[in-house]
């Protein structure tokens, strides 16, 4: 009879280790779960630390970038300001110093020649750019250079000499207001209009 009791004891002893083992396995699983949660927490902490580090690193660089953009904008504004003052503002015709109306040397060659031809002044034309170029050794061999010598009647003169002749004639010329003012008004009103002639049959 002791044998069956022993068998029960063995079965109980066998059952106890299995239960204990079962408990042990459950305990090990819970430990593993706890370790996994701890690892997850550590990973989350590491991610938070990395994000904090990235934020800390991005802070100065972003501000540095904004400061760089501001400095670039200021430099561009200064460049544009200098460009306007140098190349745009100074080239405006209203800002240029206007010459005196009686300074005939400032007038163009075409105007002086038209004035001479209109009033039929006994004075030759002034030298052009080609005439000045004839002053070289190569230009001295041309016909135009020989024509401009002192012995010829149609020699060219300098622009300054022609301007002096035109100024003296203008000072000595008597102006009639009854003839000058109507012509001036007519020219101002019709300076940009083209002459049109209509034929009606």
Swiss-Prot record:
InterPro entries: His_deAcase_SAP30/SAP30L, SAP30_C_sf, SAP30_Sin3-bd. The keyword Electron transport does not apply. Keywords: Chromatin regulator, Nucleus, Repressor, Transcription, Transcription regulation. Residues 1-70 are annotated as: Disordered. Its main location: nucleus. Present with 704 molecules/cell in log phase SD medium. Component of the RPD3C(L) histone deacetylase complex (HDAC) responsible for the deacetylation of lysine residues on the N-terminal part of the core histones (H2A, H2B, H3 and H4). Histone deacetylation gives a tag for epigenetic repression and plays an important role in transcriptional regulation, cell cycle progression and developmental events. This is Transcriptional regulatory protein SAP30. It comes from Saccharomyces cerevisiae (strain ATCC 204508 / S288c) (Baker's yeast).
